[in-house]
Design a protein with these regions (language model features):
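Conserved donor-binding/catalytic core segment of Leloir-type glycosyltransferases
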Residues: 1, 145-163, 169-176, 180
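N-terminal strand-loop element at the rim of the active site
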Residues: 2-61, 66, 187
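Short donor-sugar binding/catalytic loops of nucleotide-sugar-dependent glycosyltransferases
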Residues: 5-8, 156-165, 185-186, 210
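Glycosyltransferase donor-sugar binding loop
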Residues: 32-37, 156, 178-191, 208-209
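Donor nucleotide-sugar binding/catalytic pocket of nucleotide-sugar-dependent glycosyltransferases
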Residues: 47, 113-143
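Short His-centered aromatic/hydrophobic patch
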Residues: 56, 77-83, 101
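A conserved, positively charged/aromatic
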Residues: 91-126
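Nucleotide-activated donor-binding/catalytic signature segment of Leloir-type glycosyltransferases, i.e.
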Residues: 192-210
Length: 215
């Protein structure tokens, strides 16, 4: 089973969905996640369990009860909160827990004392003795070939400061091609303001009502 604690469908959630979808060809997979993101997950089993605080004994008990009832022997936790919960599950059961670090953290305490840790970047695994580096995958069918698709250039991602969409917009001043930014997030308002400020409304659009499968 895969455990996600967030209530929005962003990069981590998409990664988990694609991973579980592929792994379901070999074994049964289920994603434990917030009900708010169920609509984004197709063709993979999913269930919603109220998690709340990562330290709540009641919430931990709910999750543990579900795992035992469904005879789940391996819990793959994604992110710091899910990994903290997984670590507590490991303390009180024989369920194996694997954590994946998806981004830089101030400290790696949530990922300590689990059975195995996966990092998509070698630097993320510093100080973790049982860490394994597995880089993010890509579809090698593209082989670096230029797309034959007609239409605007697409940039897809969650609209957060760390993604650098503001730099992308600023770089578009001298580019004639049209750009569609597909995503949603807290930076949407400021990015729209930046597009207006640079008078790029005719070149750049932000599309928020587009789910994973339609992309």
């Amino acid at each position: 089973a895969h455990l996600i604690s967030s209530n929005t469908f962003g990069g981590i959630e998409q990664h988990v969905y694609e991973l579980a979808n592929k792994m379901s060809e070999e074994s049964e997979q289920i994603i434990i996640c917030n009900k708010k993101i169920h609509s984004y997950i197709k063709d993979v089993n999913k269930v919603s369990i109220k998690i709340g605080s990562r330290y709540s004994p009641l919430n931990i008990f709910r999750l543990l009860k579900y795992l035992k009832h469904n005879k789940i022997s391996l819990l793959h936790c994604h992110g710091a909160k899910a990994s903290t919960i997984g670590k507590l599950i490991r303390y009180v059961s024989k369920i194996k827990v694997v954590s994946t670090i998806h981004g830089h953290k101030k400290n790696n305490k949530p990922f300590m004392k689990v059975d195995a840790v996966i990092g998509v970047n070698k630097k993320l695994l510093r100080g973790i003795s049982n860490g394994t580096y597995i880089p993010n995958w890509f579809n090698n069918n593209h082989q670096g070939k230029q797309s034959t698709r007609k239409g605007p250039i697409l940039a897809v991602g969650r609209l957060e400061k760390v993604k650098g969409f503001d730099h992308l917009i600023q770089s578009w001043i001298n580019i004639e091609n049209k750009l569609d930014i597909v995503g949603s997030g807290p930076e949407e308002k400021s990015l729209r303001s930046l597009i207006d400020y640079l008078n790029l409304q005719d070149k750049i659009k932000i599309i928020t009502n587009c789910d994973y499968n339609s992309i």
